[in-house]
């Protein structure tokens, strides 16, 4: 589970920062989680947890549930937040985020 990668207290802090009404900001989310300070192996582990269908990609519907991937308390992203994050992360334009793209997205945060 995600708590094997990131301490639960950090997950809770990050999830609560983006309650309903708070615009989702991936960079801020990554910093609150401390994900940018984790090892590449941990970032890859987080990716695989978010990749619910084990396709090797985070598709748009999985991206919309990214906060829920960290905690069931998390809200769904709005359609606009999801699209914005997809555009930011999808470097090769295939409409989904691969592990290398996810790692880059975290590293750039």
Curated annotation (Swiss-Prot):
GO molecular function: calcium ion binding
A GO CC term assigned to this protein in UniProt: cytoplasm
Function: In muscle, parvalbumin is thought to be involved in relaxation after contraction. It binds two calcium ions.
Record: residues binding Ca(2+) 1: 51, 53, 55, 57, 59, 62
Organism lineage: Eukaryota, Metazoa, Chordata, Craniata, Vertebrata
Protein name: Parvalbumin alpha
Family under the similarity heading: Belongs to the parvalbumin family.
Domain of life: Eukaryota
Assigned keywords, A-Z: Calcium, Metal-binding, Muscle protein, Repeat
InterPro entries hit by this protein: EF-hand-dom_pair (IPR011992), EF_Hand_1_Ca_BS (IPR018247), EF_hand_dom (IPR002048), Parvalbumin (IPR008080)
């Amino acid at each position: 589970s995600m708590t094997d990668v990131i301490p639960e207290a950090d997950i809770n802090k990050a999830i609560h920062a983006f309650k309903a009404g708070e615009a989702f900001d991936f960079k801020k989310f990554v910093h609150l989680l401390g994900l940018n300070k984790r090892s590449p192996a941990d970032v890859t582990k987080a990716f695989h947890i978010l990749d619910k269908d084990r396709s090797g990609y985070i598709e748009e519907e999985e991206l919309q549930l990214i906060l829920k991937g960290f905690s069931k308390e998390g809200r769904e992203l709005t359609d606009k937040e999801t699209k914005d994050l997809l555009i930011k992360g999808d470097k090769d334009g295939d409409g989904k985020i691969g592990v290398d793209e996810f790692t880059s997205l975290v590293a750039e945060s």
